[in-house]
Amino acid sequence: MAARTRSLVERRRVLMAGVRSHTRFYKALAEEVREFHATKICGTLLTLLSGSLQGRSVFEATRVTLICEVDLGPRRPDCICVFEFANDKTLGGVCVIIELKTCKYISSGDTASKREQRATGMKQLRHSLKLLQSLAPPGDKIVYLCPVLVFVAQRTLRVSRVTRLVPQKVSGNITAVVRMLQSLSTYTVPIEPRTQRARRRRGGAARGSASRPKRSHSGARDPPESAARQLPPADQTPTSTEGGGVLKRIAALFCVPVATKTKPRAASE
């Protein structure tokens, strides 16, 4: 009984690790799609998927859409990345059907577990391909359905193996295909808005600068206010005798006595 309980716990732990790896993969790929639209920079995962674009360049795509956990009824492919080619006269787009398999160690070679995963993944992809062929909305342009099996490491998401099945060609409307797949999606990747990320970075920088003492441009610390406000002692306050000294010298020439003018000292409390 105890051994059976441990086995169930271990299976659940492995399953949850795989689920976490899947969601992290979706997030990483969605981030690359967003950056591609904003900057036309193609990330690692998009570059990998571009090998299924039937000779087209990823930079020819007018739009890239990632749709996760598509419910096709009997099957639910992990994600489908759709590349639209609106400027092409014959090609409407390419749907890359991705089945993801995770492994704890990618350096362990071709183990029995990986062979089983590969056989299962290929079967799942063929099933998903048939379902999509029957569900694709009709149209007058070519749409390629390209199944891809991807092995990644659970922690690093490093891709260790990619297997591409023979693509299938159908006549369809790629815009309608995207709408259909989005309506069947059961998982949406939570993407943090750019403004929120920038606001958090600015807040962290402000908190860091507030904790450090302010320095002047010369690199020295600002003098304390008490030192700036110090006044000389009362007994060292000079008397104003500038005018008296000049008059004394003039009066000495004519032998006329002149009184010295001094300012009264402030009375100390």
Swiss-Prot record:
Q: What subcellular compartments does it reside in?
A: Virion; Host cytoplasm; Host nucleus, Host nucleolus; Host Golgi apparatus
InterPro entries xref list: Herpes_UL24
Outcome recorded upon mutating S226P: In strain: Nonneuroinvasive mutant HF10
Q: Which domain of life is it from?
A: Viruses
In the record, the effect of T239A is given as: In strain: Nonneuroinvasive mutant HF10 and 17 syn+
Recorded GO cellular component terms are:
host cell Golgi apparatus; host cell nucleolus; virion component
Does the record's keyword annotation contain NAD? no
Q: Where is this region: Disordered?
A: 191-244
A Pfam family of this chain: Herpes_UL24
Q: What is its main location?
A: virion
Q: Which UniProt keywords apply?
A: Host cytoplasm, Host Golgi apparatus, Host nucleus, Virion
Q: Is Magnesium there in the keyword field?
A: no
The UniProt induction remark is:
Expressed late in the infection cycle.
Entry similarity comment: Belongs to the herpesviridae UL24 family.
| Biological function | May participate in nuclear egress of viral particles. Plays a role in the dispersal of several host nucleolar proteins including NCL/nucleolin and NPM1. Since deletion of host NCL/nucleolin negatively impact on nuclear egress, UL24 supposedly acts on this process through its effect on host nucleoli.
Protein name (record): Protein UL24
Tell me what organism the protein belongs to. Answer: Human herpesvirus 1 (strain 17)
Source taxonomy lineage? Viruses, Duplodnaviria, Heunggongvirae, Peploviricota, Herviviricetes
